[in-house]
Amino acid sequence: HLDYAHLNWSEVRELCGSPLVEIGNHTYDLHEFKGKDGRKGANIKKGEAFADYKKVLTDDVTKLQEKMNEHLYQSSRVFAYPYGFYSDESEKILKGLGFDITLTCDEGVNLITKDKECLYGLKRYNRPYRAETEAFFKNIGIE
């Protein structure tokens, strides 16, 4: 988010050199929350035709994939939904674009199996800035 955190391409490229870091796609420009009937992040709008939505999401995500190829010499296999808003439609489109993993903002623990489908719609916990590791995990029930 431009108001509180960002990296430049050089910094991201440096991170790509680590086997511990995976750089993901978070859309190029679908980070708005436009009220009750508007678009919420990368999600389909109420009443929007699937074909129209598919074009919007595909064009946007592809633009960032192309930028990643240009600056990082690789694209992403991972997609994190802005604001965590997702739908069956978005999952279908992203699978079609070659993403292997999607991350929501739903809180919870994931059960990872040998079935690749379990990597779509993954839950996660948002760790607040400055939260102590031990206290954070204790708070979510992991000790």
Residue ranges and their predicted role:
Residues 14-18, 22, 28-143:
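C-terminal active-site subregion of NodB/CE4 polysaccharide deacetylases
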